[in-house]
């Protein structure tokens, strides 16, 4: 299916979006009509010109030309030329700027004027303007908090395969690679692939999946041709950006068709190289088209497509005991699935304890379950921009559409296949305000859980009970009982041989069609009665061998079935409806720069019961917030005070207040040095999954803690051991409800210690952070220095705990009667394997804090060579003894060093860049696996050449060119090398 076919099939404005904004649209269109009919003809001033480098005389593409104090303007083309009209009579001033160059101003005095501008290379990058730190333009030097930035010039020179990959070279930034197409960005610790503590805003829209509550990297984000700027705020920012702006925010802003018109195209190809996967080609291509029809109307469209092969995950170490091999009867390989299904053979078949122990089914390697490891991403972006007057009022209608395949590692490894997400936005904005509303709508497509794919492929061949019965019969030697007269001699293996017993159970030797009359008679006479069966009746198949027609048929059936008892597909059509607004009183109030704003959001969870407990229809809940900020300068504009206050309320929780206060002071005659200090609080609401998930993940059942969720969730029937049935009213099965995990469970640590105790924890509530930060920025000629240090103190930190729920009995042993019972029923349940692990969502009472620092130096050496180095330190403290069942999951190296070296013009039109990243070892904790991650050094490099006559940039590069494979978390595929060549026209 082509991307454009998908667009035709799936592109629509959801009817629910129409219901929400139809009144706004009617009023807005009326306003537009009135404004249009009431508009007058303004005088037009035509301006043309060129922008060149002062040192080399080379044209500068992508330079920003704006009317000072307004958003009207344009950018230079590949040859440094520009032309635009301004509905304003002279005189007025133009500002010309670009990252890496000192901005300049030019006075326009005539109605038809041509100008020539030269830009000097900036001594440092500290004069660059950012918006995200305070929601208002300000120099990086004066920003009240730490901020990182990237724009088109740095995208051109990045040594990484994509601009998004290049974010890893910024100081303080961690990029955890889930797969080739899914990179998870984080700052300041507590990283996961499901990074709900880090926000990503694309043109003001939260790019998170409604069901997952986190973004999938740039899988469904922005094409690099359309990127104008990327800004990253490390740390808490809840005071301005609300819930979940907890660890940081990434802002991606696209180019305006008013300022960046024309057609741009890129093509990229190369190989990914990995020991497990070999060498595989990838392709990446895109086009951006933008046209300014008039001073009032402009439009753009961009498309990009990437296809490649994922990194193969081939870690076959035993999950619980890494030293054990497949010879272990209870083997559970990390990247092998289906072997999680295991039973205590002694309890089930009433053999003496220690005779057979626990045995697992034979699993399948992940490489056989990922349908070719296809990595794919297709993105489209359409926007209409209308400026009804010659002022700065602008109306934007924007649609972003993405479709892709990737792999996500959560509690299990999920093949995100044919995932589709769309966002539609209507925005009205001006110099001092914006109002926007958007909808995020997703479709899980053909996504499935690889673990349950394996489990149910096994079950489609032979049921669990039949497989374990066959293993027992072979291992115990029951088939070789002399009473059967040796009729099973030709098929039964020698007893006590685990490998032979497993092979016997994987076969279909006891299928009725495979038996002769003597064997079938023996089974009916001796084995069936002993097992409580009325007769022997088997229609099993042998284990399906990967690559066989039987395996393919079973795989296709299981991955298209959304019932986890028989399939592995998960469905999702969840949505987010969001509106937010901001108004800056800067032009109306002289005393200070004051702005106010607010937001409202509604979640509509719709997984048809495959992820959430939405069995009877979508689950809906809302949250809203409002904020105010004041900024004031004192002492000859050297001292800047910023104070912010925000209130947020989520439907299921009490409201939260988030204050932020910061002070910065500029030193030196040219204000080129700046000291800053800030205090702020942040909070994070429990995610949709924290509250409403109801999912059997194989190793554990995940149940969210919303009160109405606890009673909705119920397990499939669970088999009770023969011994346990006397405590379960004689019933052979039991169903557990979600509430049991929170009210009648054992803590895992107590069971592991041999002293089972009832777990004790509360329902999940918002977590909070109090953050302190100090920093110093300075420019010394061609050298810039940026240092910061922070300390974060957390309260009610949200996390998971694993508890064990007994099939019968009370976990506090209150039902124990010593005179009639040998032991408490719940304790007997533990001894017989009659329990189920649950993962619950709660808050830790432990004291948790983190602290760290970053230092970055950038300068010019040997003339025009750029050199940069930065160091990041990160550490956390957690009182594990106060909460032994809690895993904090800091998942961040204590030390990181990053170095860059390059030159954009080594000789005429030739440039290069090299990035080196070193990361210390660290411990990774997650619901999938806990393990150490080794230290690593990664080298990326690129060489580029510009051909002005063709308006083209050619690049050749490589990522991890050292070739030593590594991973950022255990369980994922090891990252090999990636080599590429690219051709960009009109970048």
Regions found by a protein language model. Give the residues of each.
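Short, acidic, small-residue-rich periplasmic hinge/interaction motif at the N-terminus
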Residues: 52-56, 61-68, 93-102, 109-156
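Short acidic/polar hinge/loop motifs at secondary-structure boundaries
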Residues: 83-85, 206-236
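N-terminal periplasmic accessory domains that precede
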Residues: 114-118, 163-166, 183-189, 198-203, ...
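Predominantly transmembrane beta-strands of Gram-negative outer membrane beta-barrel pores used
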Residues: 199-201, 229, 233, 249-255, ...
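Conserved C-terminal beta-signal and adjacent last beta-strands/turns
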Residues: 290-296, 304-306, 375-377, 420-424, ...
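Gram-negative outer-membrane beta-barrel transporters
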Residues: 633-637, 784, 788-923, 984-986
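Outer-membrane beta-barrel signature, preferentially recognizing the C-terminal barrel domain
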Residues: 681-794, 841-852, 858-860, 892-894
